Amino acid sequence: MTIGLIGRKVGMTRVFTEDGVSIPVTVLECSPNRVTQVKTLDTDGYQALQVTAGSKKASRVNKPEAGHFAKAGVEAGRGLWEFTLADNEGADIKVGAELSVELFNEINKVDVTGQSKGKGFQGAIKRWNFSMQDATHGNSVSHRAPGSIGQCQTPGRVFKGKKMAGHMGAERVTTQNLEVVRVDIERNLLLVKGAVAGAKNGDVIIKPAVKA
């Protein structure tokens, strides 16, 4: 199954097993996802479900968005996401339908995608976990410097992809094979074992695990 849900990271807590073992979990709020468009091979060249989640103030919805949501007959959400469909999947899902956290009732492992916390401009020590140079023994000013970044006249340049200082974080990060600890249908909550990338209240994409 390739259909997933759009959720929101609430935060982390822990749950206990009957034996008293503490399990760290991330709480994901999965409010019902509304289907805004069903893409087909005939009209779009591929099969996918387009969904929205949450809500957005009417004053914040521009005219193209308003028209798109009105055509689907659903309330405007905070964004639009797509789930590519496999062959013969999702044939019974129509525009306006709702997908709930109940989708994960029979699933043990999930992949969760979020945007990692932005750290701004960082040096090579923090960004790439480089070792620091000597604190003393004649070293000055170069304690947190990355060191050599290349060779001499040959090749006479710095190779692409060289690990150097730069912007860190604020990247799309997928954490794979997270165990589903609990599915709370009444409160639209999904509890997964371990950490998920991103800050609290950040949007996350939850899919059945690919490598499970």
Curated annotation (Swiss-Prot):
It comes from the Bacteria. Keywords: Methylation, Ribonucleoprotein, Ribosomal protein, RNA-binding, rRNA-binding. InterPro entries: Ribosomal_uL3, Ribosomal_uL3_bac/org-type, Ribosomal_uL3_CS, Transl_B-barrel_sf. GO terms for cellular component: cytosolic large ribosomal subunit. GO terms for molecular function: rRNA binding; structural constituent of ribosome. One of its GO terms (biological process) is translation. The modification N5-methylglutamine is found at residue 153. Belongs to the universal ribosomal protein uL3 family. One of the primary rRNA binding proteins, it binds directly near the 3'-end of the 23S rRNA, where it nucleates assembly of the 50S subunit. Part of the 50S ribosomal subunit. Forms a cluster with proteins L14 and L19. This is Large ribosomal subunit protein uL3.
